[in-house]
Design a protein with these regions (language model features):
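A conserved amphipathic helix/loop scaffold
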Residues: 6, 11-180
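A short, well-structured beta->alpha microelement
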Residues: 1-4
Length: 180
């Protein structure tokens, strides 16, 4: 049996409820999940849920939202942002309200300063990160490094990420991708 130290849900827009429930259990049992905007927004048939988002993952992620927008000159702020060259939110942003999580990054804008952009939630035995907007690669790298620390993975990454991509077939005959 393989133990996954850090799981990611990159814009996992359409997902069956059972997969989202497994992700909840994964974090509950000590895993570290990094999820991005629109994760779990619709079911496997691409039917958008009427529930407050991120619906099934809401407790695990410790956030909720029902508003999103397109950023125009929206900057990001927070300790983890300090010293990065590009602090701008890009392309898309969810307006996250806390429901147990701590804020790592806020929107620094007169309209959106009451909302979180990136959060971290200690849920049962594990941690869940939620990234509610597109951002600069340097800031994303910092957030991922923090998640690796929570998973007690140290000294495995060089100065820059070399990304290795592997494709396989799972037990259900579905393609799976691994980004290492």
């Amino acid at each position: 049996q393989v133990k996954i130290e850090v799981g990611t849900g990159w814009a996992l827009y359409a997902a069956p409820d059972r997969l989202l429930e497994k992700l909840n259990r994964y974090v509950e049992n000590g895993g570290c999940l990094v999820a991005t905007f629109k994760t779990g927004f619709a079911n496997e048939n691409v039917k958008v849920s009427h529930e407050v988002q991120p619906r099934i993952l809401r407790n695990c992620l410790g956030v909720k939202y029902h508003l999103f927008t397109f950023p125009k000159k929206v900057m990001l702020r927070g300790d983890i942002v300090e010293g990065t060259d590009n602090r701008e939110a890009k392309v898309f942003m969810e307006l996250l309200k806390l429901d147990g999580a701590e804020v790592l990054v806020y929107y620094d804008h007169y309209n959106w300063n009451g909302y979180a952009a990136v959060t971290r939630n200690h849920f049962a035995e594990g941690y869940a990160y939620y990234i509610g907007c597109m951002m600069d690669q340097e800031l994303l790298k910092r957030i991922l490094m923090k998640a690796l620390e929570d998973a007690d993975i140290k000294n495995i990454v060089k100065e820059e990420f070399p990304v290795i991509v592997r494709k396989g077939i799972n037990d259900f005959g579905k393609s799976v991708w691994f980004y290492l």
